[in-house]
């Protein structure tokens, strides 16, 4: 996609996000659906779309670590833990951090932590940079159906009018690995 078309798609996606709606976009492995993490209305729309209970918690993806800092508590990290995390980012590894009390429950669910990732997908990086904050991100698929890997699959599952940022996935076969930021415990193999 040339830069003008990509810029137009990102600008259109930001308009949708500002309307507290959900968008789809390519990530490292599959298409994701996401929304503004600061909008309870938008997050509830995403959860309803996915038929996902709010208590499960969600993942935020960002262009850089600074975008994630308002949502996580990294004060307990040692230098070694920080080094481990930053050696994986940007990339397809999600880390679960303690969350401060100010992080909304519609993001953390029943947990006192939040899963976050600094993406290396160039289109998602550009989207988060243009939006100025991270996005809630979960796989683009309706309950019981496989995750979408193309724009056509997104449209088949969510409808022709669903807002999609066109592009290619990063080609990974598996979803992101998920690890505990403090202990390194593996929650999901990537």
Curated annotation (Swiss-Prot):
Role summary: Required for the formation of a threonylcarbamoyl group on adenosine at position 37 (t(6)A37) in tRNAs that read codons beginning with adenine. Catalyzes the conversion of L-threonine, HCO(3)(-)/CO(2) and ATP to give threonylcarbamoyl-AMP (TC-AMP) as the acyladenylate intermediate, with the release of diphosphate.
Taxonomic superkingdom: Bacteria
Enzyme class, broadest EC rank: transferase
Cited Pfam families: Sua5_yciO_yrdC
Organism: Shigella flexneri serotype 5b (strain 8401)
Name under which the protein is recorded: Threonylcarbamoyl-AMP synthase
Reaction(s) the record says it catalyses: L-threonine + hydrogencarbonate + ATP = L-threonylcarbamoyladenylate + diphosphate + H2O
One record GO biological process: tRNA threonylcarbamoyladenosine modification
Family: Belongs to the SUA5 family. TsaC subfamily.
């Amino acid at each position: 996609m040339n830069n003008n078309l990509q810029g137009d798609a990102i600008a259109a996606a930001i308009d949708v996000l500002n309307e507290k709606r959900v968008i789809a976009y390519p990530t490292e492995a599959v298409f994701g659906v996401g929304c503004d993490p600061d909008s309870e209305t938008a997050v509830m729309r995403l959860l309803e779309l996915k038929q996902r209970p709010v208590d499960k918690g969600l993942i935020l993806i960002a262009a850089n670590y600074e975008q994630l800092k308002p949502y996580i508590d990294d004060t307990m990290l040692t230098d070694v833990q920080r080094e481990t995390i930053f050696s994986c980012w940007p990339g397809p590894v999600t880390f679960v951090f303690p969350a401060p009390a100010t992080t909304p429950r519609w993001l953390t669910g029943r947990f006192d932590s939040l899963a976050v990732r600094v993406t290396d997908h160039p289109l998602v990086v550009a989207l988060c940079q243009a939006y100025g904050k991270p996005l809630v991100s979960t796989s683009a698929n309706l309950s019981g159906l496989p995750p979408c890997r193309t724009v056509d699959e997104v449209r088949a599952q969510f409808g022709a009018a669903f807002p999609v940022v066109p592009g290619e996935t990063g080609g990974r076969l598996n979803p992101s690995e998920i690890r505990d930021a403090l202990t390194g415990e593996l929650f999901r193999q990537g």
